[in-house]
Amino acid sequence: MRPSQTALWLGLVLSLALLAVGWASARPPIYVSSWAVRVTKGYQEAERLARKFGFVNLGQIFPDDQYFHLRHRGVAQQSLTPHWGHRLRLKKEPKVRWFEQQTLRRRVKRSLVVPTDPWFSKQWYMNKEIEQDLNILKVWNQGLTGRGVVVSILDDGIEKDHPDLWANYDPLASYDFNDYDPDPQPRYTPNDENRHGTRCAGEVSATANNGFCGAGVAFNARIGGVRMLDGAITDIVEAQSLSLQPQHIHIYSASWGPEDDGRTVDGPGLLTQEAFRRGVTKGRQGLGTLFIWASGNGGLHYDNCNCDGYTNSIHTLSVGSTTRQGRVPWYSEACASTFTTTFSSGVVTDPQIVTTDLHHQCTDKHTGTSASAPLAAGMIALALEANPLLTWRDLQHLVVRASRPAQLQAEDWRINGVGRQVSHHYGYGLLDAGLLVDLARVWLPTKPQKKCTIRVVHTPTPILPRMLVPKNVTVCCDGSRRRLIRSLEHVQVQLSLSYSRRGDLEIFLTSPMGTRSTLVAIRPLDISGQGYNNWIFMSTHYWDEDPQGLWTLGLENKGYYYNTGTLYYCTLLLYGTAEDMTARPQTPQESHCPLSIVAELCLISSKQWWWLYSHTQQPVTKGQDSCHPPTTPARQLDQRLHCLFPAPHAGSASEPLQGLSPLAAILAISLGPWCCPC
């Protein structure tokens, strides 16, 4: 064959290969026989629709009367096309506010399969075998073991009768959303593919001092399991799993997500986003549910966890991995949304994580970021035992402060605008359980979350090989010009753009205080030409920085090809609080409060009533000048106390406790004449 013909054939083969990769990265949706429907008249209307159109009403998706799960036995269980007939019928119904035929969602467990190595009998990551471990023994020595905290593992089930799990097993924190029954027992297969959830559960709450296997980080916490990954995964299944018993479960731990293949951009559907929102606003009696998420195992494919809409949600706490030697594991994904890091393993000769396994066994072969997230969930359970009144945002602030660079090795460690070291590989560093609990005991409640939305680009703009888009932020104020945000928390960039080869485009953001955060780095396997459609990137690297000043969005072609594209719109979303969080002590301070449970509460005495101040009603600030003028004898209280607000209508003996939660009212009556500085 002549050289010209050879080159032609090679080019054709290469083109076909690239097309195959492109098709694989843009799979068509697979529609199933389930619909999510939102109706205005609740259960009766859902029943009427089901009878009229031949659906089976499988009940509410959330614990209210709006969203329902309908299934049609006459529709194919899997199809490449939606059912247009039912779409048109539901669209004509005036009481149907929204509906969506469900599609299968590809979700992979974030564990790693490695060759069998000799058994490691010691849990090196928490028994002081290494100098800088997770510092869990310090917390155990204080008598904290997770008692009173409930954790649920969202995965492929949990072996509830395991000798190291049955004593802590909580059926109220468990369910099977694959078969819709209360039993989360995993399905057994010849290769034990459904061992993942049982392994994660043992890391959190394996029973201690029973002569079997090892001990969980929070070995007296109650543990549940949700079976949801061993079957058809839809938006309904994910939302129901994340909404299970939100007033009973404190922490959900998830070690799964979209495919870590270096070319997928995917995230939660509408129902799952709603489940996250409801969890943090209504869960735990309004304190907010904790969603702990594994950051991902796509490092081998140069994946980036900011292309995963679960790990980069402001409602989840994303956890990365490091090895015993403090190195970046080969599977680890670097991204700006990671908060913190715990241990796992790297190469096959590295020691791994000891935990429970199927068939009433133990294993020392648990690894990947799947192993890291449950360790963090257990440590947060210890912090919640120390201070049950922490909100979901309080815990995120505490994790930032309780993570330390320690011995973690990476070339991208940087100091942000408030002096903290941060890395795309590790977030703020290795989570220290002892420091986390010490801070939790004396933590004062964070002021309410504020949000600023700033439009950066609103007209289509061609993307240059290297483009910088500046935006001066001066409007994070309310109508009275009071600053809404003084200290940042999460920062998001929401944008839509087209690009001829998406994986070649690097996007970064620089804050007014000079912190540069890479929102997405080059992904060589992502050859998609679809760009990003209304995608949200998130960074934790600006935590506690001042948002006022010049922000700069950068876009740069990092590939070997000439690429073209258009930035259609871009919005900067700033979340934070009106308090200057840098003024708070960065290390635990001695508490003068006699009961740690009221570390977040101010109690004052007036006319024989104990008034209780809760952070959900008024902000806590220092100094009398910052307070609303008190109208009762609270004026005469010692000025060394922070702001103390009397209950309204103090003249009535029946009214002072109105508006308080049941827990707050009980505390107000029973704690006696203690007054704590807030």
Swiss-Prot record:
It comes from the Eukaryota. Expressed abundantly in the testis. High levels seen in germ cells but not in Leydig, Sertoli or peritubular cells. Expressed in the pachytene spermatocytes and the round spermatids but not in the elongating spermatids. May be expressed within hormonally stimulated ovaries. One of its GO terms (cellular component) is acrosomal membrane. The lineage of its organism: Eukaryota, Metazoa, Chordata, Craniata, Vertebrata. It is an enzyme of class 3 (hydrolase). CDD domains: Peptidases_S8_Protein_convertases_Kexins_Furin-like. GO terms for biological process: acrosome reaction; binding of sperm to zona pellucida; fertilization; peptide hormone processing; protein processing; reproductive process; sperm capacitation. Its main location: membrane. Residues 27-110 form a propeptide. Keywords: Cleavage on pair of basic residues, Cytoplasmic vesicle, Glycoprotein, Hydrolase, Membrane, Protease, Serine protease, Signal, Zymogen. Residues 123-437 form the Peptidase S8 domain. This is Proprotein convertase subtilisin/kexin type 4. Disulfide bonds: none annotated. SUPFAM superfamilies: Galactose-binding domain-like, Protease propeptides/inhibitors, Subtilisin-like. Glycans are attached at N472.
